[in-house]
Amino acid sequence: MKTAHYLAALLALTFSTASLTALADDMTPYGDAKVDMHKYPKINRVYDVNYDDPKKLNALVNFIKNVNKVVPGKAVVVLHGTEIRAFAKENYEKYQAVIDQLADLRKEGVDFRMCNNAMHGAGFEAKDIDGFVTIVPAGFAEVISLQNKGYKVIDATATAVKDSRYIDHPEKKPQS
């Protein structure tokens, strides 16, 4: 008799665990997310970029491309951090992949402006910087000036979300 109770309890536990796992995979108490893929109006925007590492420019490229896909309007990138060294001609070989992508964005209409103060502070002159960039008197003042002209300021903090799902659940990542 004890064996029958033990087997019944074991079966119940097995099925309840399987049911809970299926429930966790398929449902939460909140249901499914709503989808609202509406159109955005024309919005002129300025990306305020002040990175401590030029490698973060890779995330900026994707960020701008994704916003440009869904938001019509003009886009300006104001550079005033240490990322500016990536735009120096002497560093082209080191940063070529991202600089070429940014130059392609320029061809698509994205305007790149660099702070004169930051450029000089980093030890560069205008002649040292790639030709698709415009040097402006001051980065913060440029952002404020564009804001006064109706541009919306976008904090271009470089945070990539690609594959972030797998931080908590690495077992769900598809194998290559």
Which residues does each PLM region occupy?
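Bacterial N-terminal signal peptides
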Residues: 8-18
